[in-house]
Design a protein with these regions (language model features):
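Catalytic-domain carbohydrate-binding cleft regions of carbohydrate-active enzymes
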Residues: 1-139
Length: 139
């Protein structure tokens, strides 16, 4: 939900074994100039980042066969009713008839992308945040 982060986050996430960060922002946010998917490095630490200019939707990377589809409610809303979740799964199956559609975790998709991380563009810079400023925002 936050448009940018300090690269210090890379080290913190890497130390916890997190391999994938998905950043989705609302339409009013100014977007940084970064690839849709990249390997973000800070020293010896690295994570894969998927940067989306919206909440939810499909993400397909050219180096893998799988598609990640985020289907959730918008900003500051609760979880959908179970019936809506099942209907959304049916809708997604109709959109991707050649795929097996199943619920999964970010970690499931992270493991798949991690295998091709050397092929991704590399970013080693900060990703400026248009919402927060100052030294207190940098761990």
């Amino acid at each position: 939900d936050v448009p940018g982060h300090t690269k210090g986050l890379v080290t913190l996430l890497h130390k916890k074994g997190i391999k994938l960060l998905h950043i989705g922002v609302n339409g009013a946010s100014a977007l940084p100039e970064v690839p849709e998917c990249f390997l973000w490095k800070n020293g010896d630490s690295e994570i894969v980042v998927i940067y989306s200019g919206a909440y939810g939707g499909a993400y397909k990377n050219e180096y893998i066969d799988e598609i990640l589809y985020f289907d959730h409610t918008l900003d500051n809303r609760g979880a959908p009713a179970p019936e809506k979740v099942l209907k959304h799964l049916d809708d997604i199956r109709n959109m991707y008839p050649d795929y097996i559609v199943e619920a999964g975790t970010m970690d499931d998709f992270a493991e798949i992308l991690w295998e091709v991380r050397e092929k991704l563009p590399v970013i080693e810079n900060e990703i400026g945040d248009t919402w927060i400023h100052g030294s207190a925002t940098d761990p």
